[in-house]
Regions:
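Active-site beta->alpha loop and helix N-cap motifs at the rims of alpha/beta catalytic domains
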Residues: 2-154
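Glycine- and other small-residue-rich loops at beta-strand/loop junctions that grip anionic moieties
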Residues: 24-25, 50, 79, 146-149, ...
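Catalytic cores of alpha/beta
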Residues: 84-93, 151-157, 180-186, 203-211, ...
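Active-site glycine-rich loop that binds ribose-phosphate moieties when present
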Residues: 147-167, 177
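Active-site pocket-lining/capping segments in soluble small-molecule metabolic enzymes
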Residues: 24-28, 115-141, 191-253, 268, ...
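Charge-patterned, long linear interaction tracts outside catalytic cores
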Residues: 160, 259-275
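Conserved, mostly hydrophobic/aromatic
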Residues: 74, 160-163, 196, 248, ...
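Active-site glycine- and acidic-residue-rich loops that bind
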Residues: 81-85, 110-118, 169-182, 204, ...
Length: 289
């Protein structure tokens, strides 16, 4: 399928369903509150955690956006949490807010700030604390990880499954890989609902650069496997996710797939991504009032 071509009617219906209530991931850089303001009231916004900005910045932005009526999901990076006391203070920041979901990841801090080396460590600590979260997301790698074996990734998911309510995948360009991975999870007894991580409408060159830096993109094996896609990404101005999202929507149309939506990596290009979602589901293209 041509990734820029409008989907057929049946595919359009599946795509509209998949894109109903998407998650918009943003980076808590300066000015992000103004960029998010174009989203409709109540939209789900996830706020990343970066060693360069700190978890406190993640929570500052999360609290501010929640106060504006968004459904906010802060990322908690285990390797950025220095101690149980630090974790308790972070949770206290959310007291009095409507934030009821977190996304727990290992993170990129090297060395780690404390004793939490991966998401499993932090999830186990969270389970022993009083916290307000009705939903806890964890990450998944449909195309594998350059530094972790597939078996180790599966074992980590088995460890984390009791503490989580859903899986959110790493940025992915291969719908078939997502489908194979979901089937593998089910065969291995991992039954968490899956939210598929897709690129939003972003600058192709920037997307290519970030794809090489983030997660699986750092490995030579990834470059060998996806080099053609990376070159293609860099050739024109903006990436259109319609084709990829439509392919994912076909798999998601099977209720047994367990695919429950999409997590859109906006890289802070919120407005064009929002406009694409609105066009795809047939809704109005208008900012929040």
């Amino acid at each position: 399928m041509d990734r820029g071509r409008a989907p057929a009617f049946a595919d359009q219906s599946a795509l509209s369903l998949l894109l109903t209530g998407p998650r918009y991931e943003v980076i808590p850089a300066q000015g992000i509150e103004q960029k998010v303001a174009v989203l409709p009231y109540g939209a789900t916004v996830t706020v990343t955690a970066s060693p360069s900005l700190g978890l406190e910045r993640t929570l500052d932005v999360s609290v501010a956006l929640a106060a504006r009526g968004y459904r906010v999901v802060p990322h908690l990076a285990a390797r950025m949490v220095s101690s149980r006391g630090h974790l308790e203070r972070l949770l206290q920041r959310l007291d009095g807010t409507d934030i009821r979901e977190v996304f727990v990841i290992g993170g990129d801090a090297d060395p780690p700030a404390g004793d939490y080396r991966d998401a499993g460590d932090l999830l186990e600590e969270l389970a022993g604390l009083s916290h307000p979260f009705a939903h806890v997301g964890i990450g998944g790698y449909p195309e594998g990880h350059p530094l972790i074996s597939d078996e180790a990734l599966l074992e980590a998911l088995r460890r984390k499954q009791p503490f989580a309510t859903q899986l959110v995948t790493q940025l992915c360009f291969d719908a078939d890989a997502v489908a194979r991975w979901v089937r593998l999870l089910r065969d291995q007894g991992i039954q968490l609902p899956v939210v598929v991580g897709l690129p939003g409408v972003v600058d192709r060159r920037r997307l290519a650069e970030i794809s090489l830096k983030a997660g699986v993109g750092a490995s030579l094996s990834y470059l060998r496997k996806h080099g053609r896609q990376i070159v293609t990404l860099a050739r024109s101005r903006r990436y259109d996710p319609t084709g990829l999202a439509t392919e994912v929507a076909r798999y998601a149309a099977d209720p047994g797939s367990g695919i429950r939506g999409v997590h859109l990596f906006t890289f802070n290009n919120v407005e064009p991504t929002r406009d694409w979602v609105a066009r795809s589901v047939g809704g109005p293209v208008s900012p929040a009032s």
